[in-house]
């Protein structure tokens, strides 16, 4: 959370993320009740820690901007599983649908990684389908790059650079 007033900086000095820990809703509620002409912007929430019901509750706050960066990583459940992501593309789209019900022009941006090890053309096409269905304002597209010491770096089925570049 960032605010125009310095006092917002220390309002809640730790990460307040997961719903099971109370989530960010109490902080948004407190800030929303402050008089003044300002907006609250959330960024980079992960579908693994929120769900459609949680998003629906957050949308009742008037000062909350109708923009969210919600990282998908992939539209393929196969690739999401390989990435050890604890959500499916269907769960991701449930969140998007709630946002669109609230405001058809709700600004949603995302990250998509192409060329993750073992990604097939069908997996890639699932990501394209998710992009089309979600109607993102912007997609931050990245080619997978091997990082020493990560589980993915040691996986079989590394995708050749020319295929990653094409995708």
Task: Locate the predicted segments by residue.
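Conserved SAM/AdoMet-binding glycine-rich loop
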Residues: 1-121
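Auxiliary Fe-S-binding modules of radical SAM enzymes
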Residues: 6, 32, 47, 88, ...
């Amino acid at each position: 959370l960032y605010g125009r007033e310095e006092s917002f900086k220390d309002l809640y000095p730790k990460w307040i993320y997961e719903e099971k820990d109370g989530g960010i809703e109490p902080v948004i509620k407190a800030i929303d009740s402050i008089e003044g002409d300002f907006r609250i912007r959330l960024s980079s929430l992960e579908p693994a820690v929120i769900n459609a019901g949680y998003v629906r509750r957050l949308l009742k706050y008037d000062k909350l901007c109708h923009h969210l960066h919600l990282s998908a990583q992939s539209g393929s459940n196969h690739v999401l599983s390989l990435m050890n992501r604890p959500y499916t593309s269907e769960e991701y789209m449930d969140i998007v649908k709630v946002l669109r019900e609230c405001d058809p022009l709700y600004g949603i941006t995302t990250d998509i990684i192409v060329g993750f090890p073992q990604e097939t053309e069908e997996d890639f096409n699932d990501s394209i389908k998710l992009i089309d269905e979600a109607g993102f304002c912007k997609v931050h597209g990245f080619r997978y790059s091997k990082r020493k010491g990560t589980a993915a770096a040691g996986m079989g089925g590394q995708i050749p650079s020319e295929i990653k570049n094409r995708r």
